[in-house]
């Protein structure tokens, strides 16, 4: 999946002190979150449990250096607003690698 197909009119990212500081607790930089959205393979899942006020999604992907992250985000005014980001846990890495393999074999 490509972000350009998922969000063809993407206008960038929306950062503020709140989402920056939350990610730093997990030692994840803003630029790492952004890289995840532009590297393939990319696995995006809806997050209905946390989508009360707005639709949230979780993206599983990797940075340019290969760090595997889960980034929870929402879309606001054609911008990606990152809610949280952290390293994938072991089972999430297994899920991501399996889903990524399926994408490649399509």
Language-model region placement:
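Ribonuclease/tRNase effector modules and their secretory precursors
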Residues: 1-106
């Amino acid at each position: 999946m490509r972000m350009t197909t998922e969000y063809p009119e993407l206008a960038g990212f929306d950062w503020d002190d709140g989402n920056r500081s939350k990610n730093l607790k997990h030692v994840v930089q803003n630029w790492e979150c952004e890289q995840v959205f532009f590297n393939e393979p990319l696995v995006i899942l809806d997050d209905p449990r946390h989508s009360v006020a707005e639709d949230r999604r979780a993206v599983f992907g990797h940075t340019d250096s290969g760090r595997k992250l889960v980034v929870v985000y929402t879309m606001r005014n054609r911008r990606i607003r990152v809610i949280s980001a952290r390293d994938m846990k072991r089972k999430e890495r297994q899920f991501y690698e399996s889903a990524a393999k399926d994408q490649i074999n399509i």
